């Protein structure tokens, strides 16, 4: 594993598990270290902020989107995830594309969407969104991160234990070495996380 932290993160004591009841994961996938997370101290569960950088949008089929992969990182999207371009305003859930298929082949990671995302281009960030639960449901961010995954986590068939940091402030991360951080997770300066 390459270094992603500039110091030693403070690990939250006690067991946490990935919240597979409220978030989709594919068994065998790896959630990369440095992924922003939302820990629930009461339920002892963790949800993650799923993001990926766009490498290419297929010119002939704009529903096919290639995402960035390297030797240390692969996105952790799952079939059924709702996704939008980072920075998109709240959108009617009926108009939000879902991931219908994921194609992996070596260093290629392609998602096939239920509908194209207008204006999506190379270097944009794709981010998972959720419903706001209202009668006329619209998209919203999953939530504000309050921790970070300390190490890569392989998704298991049943419970998947996760080590997370105590918060997002006690140390710094190399931003280019972690999954893309959505603008909505940053403060007004763009240099710090809101959930500090």
List each model region and its residues.
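Surface-exposed, low-hydrophobicity beta-strand/loop segments enriched in small/polar/acidic residues
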Residues: 1-196
């Amino acid at each position: 594993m390459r270094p992603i932290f500039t110091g030693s993160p403070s690990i939250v004591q006690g067991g946490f598990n990935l919240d597979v009841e409220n978030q989709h994961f594919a068994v065998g996938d790896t959630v990369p270290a440095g992924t922003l997370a939302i820990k629930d101290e009461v339920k002892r569960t963790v949800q993650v902020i799923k993001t990926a950088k766009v490498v290419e949008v297929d010119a002939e089929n704009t529903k096919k989107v290639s995402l960035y992969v390297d030797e240390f990182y692969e996105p952790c999207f799952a079939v059924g995830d709702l996704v939008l371009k980072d920075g998109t305003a709240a959108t009617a859930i009926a108009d939000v594309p879902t991931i219908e298929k994921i194609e992996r082949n070596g260093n290629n990671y392609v998602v096939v969407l239920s509908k194209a995302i207008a204006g999506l281009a190379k270097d944009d960030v794709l981010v998972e969104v959720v419903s706001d639960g209202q009668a006329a449901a619209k998209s919203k961010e999953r939530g504000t991160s309050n921790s970070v995954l300390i190490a890569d986590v392989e998704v298991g068939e049943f419970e998947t234990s996760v080590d997370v940091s105590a918060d997002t402030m006690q140390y710094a991360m190399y931003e280019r070495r972690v999954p893309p951080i959505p603008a909505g997770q940053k403060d007004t300066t763009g240099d710090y996380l809101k959930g500090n």
